[in-house]
């Protein structure tokens, strides 16, 4: 073992502490020479800030002229269209008015329509009475209450009492449109934000999002409104609060039929929100927004020059400073376009939601721009209705009430199956084409070409082996901490077992029984923590348990900046392979990869991309992305989501086409 002795002498010469210690202490398995629990998030946020800075530079230039402003807005719209995905062809709405409830000066129609075949949407139409028809109308897009449109809407009552019809729409996962339910229609998750987040993972794999699907349902709701002769098609608005504010922001830039809008308790800047609070639930993000330099204010700006109102609370968890900065951009935009009076903001001494003062301003704004009426807002009776009387369906949920209803899971499975022949056609184009698309989906511009720098960070001599610690550095990437175990029985034919343990290399090495057999057989062990796990695990309190993902904030930030977390981990694996190719102990030895849990899909992708891997064995990991679509109540899905990947391949396809054997050990 002259090489090992030489390496140890070198370590001492470089001032690296070398000693012989036991294997019981967890600290013994740290390879990074620093410790910072939020290092990975800080690394990701640097990209968020860079992208935001580039966006700021572009918008400041746009403010110089009306032509520049229009060019900026059209650029935003085109980039938005590129990332939002495609929508189905429009079919028959098959709308049914299934009931009517009388209010004071208005009535509420209970309506069901199909936004696409088998997808039933439940809505309430608050229709003013004793008015000359057709009347102006608006969509109300619901916040995140599990009951959705519920038994009543105070804002809709006030609108209707002032001569504006309101169509209140149940979103996917709320009201009568829950998807994760038992046979009786009872929810299986604790709230709408959880259901939205779980469903969104499957949508993302298909190249869409829950936000995009909400847009489609809302678009079809407006289509329904415009089929009615009692609705004025030239005077249409949209508003929403909280999650409804999100839907409104995503909606107004793509539908020119909307003449006035209001966003409540959502408007701020994404950059600041991500830094202060982290990502929100699954319906509030479309992948690659940051990469495409689309900020929340940009979605609102696309409304210009049509009238737009922002409603905020001083004590809302939605950051007010970000809202004020975003509104300043709105003001500048509308001023440049010559219509400064068409944008306004109300900030009140309250928190989250559409309270009474905000409702007054909302209705006043809509009266002004939909009816050319600036008279005082007429008060409305605050009536209460029984939820059971307001249901559109017989059993309270469309998926257990409506013949032929399709759950979102079944819709997505059908879509996946329909694309089977397209995936086969794509995969038949050859490895060069497949690899190029794979790199694109992974968020990589190509295979990493920067040379790695190997830094030794420690060495321990044990009875049966030598233990070496390294951090592997590649420009622009997180360092990869790894531990090399060189058994005394190792020889020139010994294989390298590259072990990727989601629980961390330290946990694995702390149990001698885990690797005793490998030592006896003379196998070389290389254990590493890929970014975001092991030594760079994000503290648990930064991720809300309701999102069912231990690294939700980092996974969502990664998708936002256009660098899915799996793609980053593939780079880490390639860095480890470079280490095996370059280090004097490891050159010429075959590399077998053993991965478990979260690491499984990254190992499969790396094996397809790099022929230096001789075999892969995977345990306790997903075997196909179809699992996420069929059964979305799973943990840690976002760690392995690639936006639109299922248009091109599934994991079994990569296993079949890989140059090395890949097997599941369970």
Regions found by a protein language model. Name each.
Residues 220-292, 576-648, 652-656:
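Primarily recognizes the serine-hydrolase "nucleophile elbow" in alpha/beta-hydrolase
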Residues 146-154, 189-190, 205-213, 238-249, ...:
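Alpha-helix capping and helix-loop boundary segments enriched in small/acidic/polar residues
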């Amino acid at each position: 073992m002259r090489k090992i002795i030489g390496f140890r002498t070198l370590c001492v010469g470089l001032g690296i502490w070398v000693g012989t210690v036991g294997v019981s202490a967890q600290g013994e398995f740290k390879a990074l020479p620093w410790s910072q629990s939020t290092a990975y998030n800080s690394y990701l946020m640097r990209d968020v800030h860079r992208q935001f800075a580039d966006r700021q530079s572009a918008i400041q230039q746009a403010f110089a002229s009306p032509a520049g402003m229009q060019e900026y807005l059209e650029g935003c719209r085109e980039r938005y269209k590129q990332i939002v995905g495609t929508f189905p062809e429009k079919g028959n709405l098959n709308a049914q008015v299934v009931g009517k409830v009388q209010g004071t000066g208005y009535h509420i129609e209970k309506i069901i329509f199909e936004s696409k075949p088998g997808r039933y949407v439940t809505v309430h139409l608050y229709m003013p009475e004793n008015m000359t028809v057709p009347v102006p109308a608006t969509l109300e897009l619901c916040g995140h209450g599990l009951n959705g449109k519920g038994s009543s809407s105070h804002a809709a009552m006030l609108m209707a009492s002032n001569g504006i019809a309101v169509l209140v729409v149940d979103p996917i996962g709320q009201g009568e449109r829950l998807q994760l339910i038992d046979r009786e229609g009872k929810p299986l998750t604790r709230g709408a934000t959880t259901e939205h987040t779980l469903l969104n993972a499957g949508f993302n794999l298909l190249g869409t999002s829950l936000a995009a699907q909400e847009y489609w349902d809302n678009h079809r709701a407006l289509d329904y409104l415009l089929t009615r002769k009692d609705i004025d098609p030239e005077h249409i608005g949209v508003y929403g609060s909280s999650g409804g504010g999100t839907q409104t922001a995503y909606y107004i830039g793509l539908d020119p039929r909307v003449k006035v809008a209001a966003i409540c308790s959502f408007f701020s800047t994404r950059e600041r929100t991500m830094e202060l609070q982290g990502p929100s639930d699954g319906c509030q993000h479309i992948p690659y927004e940051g990469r495409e330099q689309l900020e929340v204010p940009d979605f609102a700006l696309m409304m210009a020059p049509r009238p737009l109102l922002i409603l905020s609370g001083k004590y809302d968890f939605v950051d007010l400073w970000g809202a004020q900065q975003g509104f300043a951009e709105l003001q500048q935009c509308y001023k440049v376009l010559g219509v400064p009076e068409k944008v306004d903001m109300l900030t009140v001494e309250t928190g989250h939601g559409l309270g009474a003062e905000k409702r007054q301003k909302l209705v006043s704004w809509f009266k002004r721009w939909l009816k050319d009426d600036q008279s005082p807002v007429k008060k409305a009776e605050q009536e209460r209705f029984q939820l059971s009387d307001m249901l559109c369906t017989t059993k309270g949920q469309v998926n257990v009430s409506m013949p032929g209803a399709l759950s979102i899971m079944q819709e997505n499975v059908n879509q996946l199956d329909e694309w089977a022949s397209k995936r086969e056609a794509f995969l038949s184009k050859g490895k060069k084409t497949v690899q190029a698309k794979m790199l694109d989906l992974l968020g990589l511009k190509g295979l990493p070409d920067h040379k790695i720098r190997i830094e030794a960070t420690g060495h321990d001599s044990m009875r049966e082996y030598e233990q070496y610690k390294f951090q592997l550095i590649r420009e622009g990437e997180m360092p990869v901490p790894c531990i090399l175990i060189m058994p005394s029985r190792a020889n020139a034919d010994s294989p390298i077992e590259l072990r990727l343990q989601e629980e961390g290399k330290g946990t694995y090495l702390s149990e001698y029984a885990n690797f005793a057999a490998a030592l006896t057989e003379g196998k070389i062990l290389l254990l590493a923590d890929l970014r975001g796990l092991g030594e760079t695990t994000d503290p648990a309190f930064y991720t809300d348990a309701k999102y069912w993902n231990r690294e939700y904030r980092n996974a969502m930030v990664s998708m936002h900046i256009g660098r899915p977390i799996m793609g980053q981990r593939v780079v880490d694996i390639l860095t480890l392979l470079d280490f095996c190719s370059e280090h004097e102990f490891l050159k010429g030895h075959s590399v077998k990869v053993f991965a478990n849990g979260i690491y499984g899909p990254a190992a499969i992708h790396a094996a397809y991309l790099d022929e230096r891997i001789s075999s892969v064995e995977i345990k306790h990991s997903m075997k196909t992305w179809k699992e996420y679509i069929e059964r979305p109540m799973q943990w840690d899905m976002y760690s392995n989501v690639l936006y639109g990947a299922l248009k091109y391949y599934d994991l079994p396809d990569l296993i079949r086409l890989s140059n090395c054997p890949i097997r599941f050990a369970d």
